[in-house]
C-alpha cells in the first residue's frame, strides 16, 4: 500500500507537477506581458513623434508639458496593467490607484506655470492611439 | 471669482465625476465578471482574456478620466473665474 502511494506520488501528474503548471502560466503571463510591451513601445514612438512636432511648432514649454503628460500616461497604463494582472489571483477588484495620476497631473499643471494644461492632457491621452492601433492589429 | 460661480463650479465638478463614473463603473464590473468567468472556464486562454480586459478597461476608464479632468479644471483652473 505504502509503495503504491509512493509510486503514485512520484508519477508524472500534471496537476501536481509544480514546474509544468508554472511554465504554462508563464506562457500565459508572457502573452500578457508582450501585449503590455507592445503598447508601451507604440506609446513611446507616438510620444517621440508628438514631442518633436510640438517642439517644432509650439516651442519648448509645450513639448516639455507633452512629454510630462505622456510619461504620466505610460505610468497610468502600467498601474492599470498591474491591477488587471492581479485580478482573480491576489485581488478581487481592479484598484483605482491609477486615477491619481491624472489628478496629480492636473494639480501639477495648476500649481506650476511651466506645465501647460492642454499639452499635458493631450500627452496623457497618447496611450489611447497606441491602444487603438494595438486593438486593430489584434488577430 | 464670485460666490455664484464658485458654487456652480463645485456642483458641476461633483456632477461631472459622479455621473461620469456611473457608466464606466457598471461596464468595468460586468467586464471583469465576464473575464474572470472566462479564465475559470478556459485557463489556457488567460493571457488573451487578460489582454482584452486590459484594453477594454483602458477604454472604459478614459471616460472616467474625462469627467475627472473636467471637474479638476473647474476646481483648480476655472476658465470662468473673472
Swiss-Prot record, chain B:
Protein keywords: ATP synthesis, CF(0), Hydrogen ion transport, Ion transport, Lipid-binding, Membrane, Thylakoid, Transmembrane, Transmembrane helix, Transport
Localisation per UniProt entry: Cellular thylakoid membrane
GO molecular function: lipid binding; proton-transporting ATP synthase activity, rotational mechanism
Transmembrane segments: 7-27, 57-77
Topology in the lipid bilayer: Multi-pass membrane protein
Listed GO CC annotations: plasma membrane-derived thylakoid membrane; proton-transporting ATP synthase complex; proton-transporting two-sector ATPase complex, proton-transporting domain
InterPro entries documented for this protein: ATP_synth_csu_bac/chlpt, ATP_synth_F0_csu, ATP_synth_F0_csu_DDCD_BS, ATP_synth_F0_csu_sf, ATPase_proteolipid_c-like_dom, F/V-ATP_Csub_sf
Chief location: membrane
Record CDD domains: ATP-synt_Fo_c_ATPH
Subunit structure: F-type ATPases have 2 components, F(1) - the catalytic core - and F(0) - the membrane proton channel. F(1) has five subunits: alpha(3), beta(3), gamma(1), delta(1), epsilon(1). F(0) has four main subunits: a(1), b(1), b'(1) and c(10-14). The alpha and beta chains form an alternating ring which encloses part of the gamma chain. F(1) is attached to F(0) by a central stalk formed by the gamma and epsilon chains, while a peripheral stalk is formed by the delta, b and b' chains.
Family, as annotated: Belongs to the ATPase C chain family.
Name assigned to this protein: ATP synthase subunit c
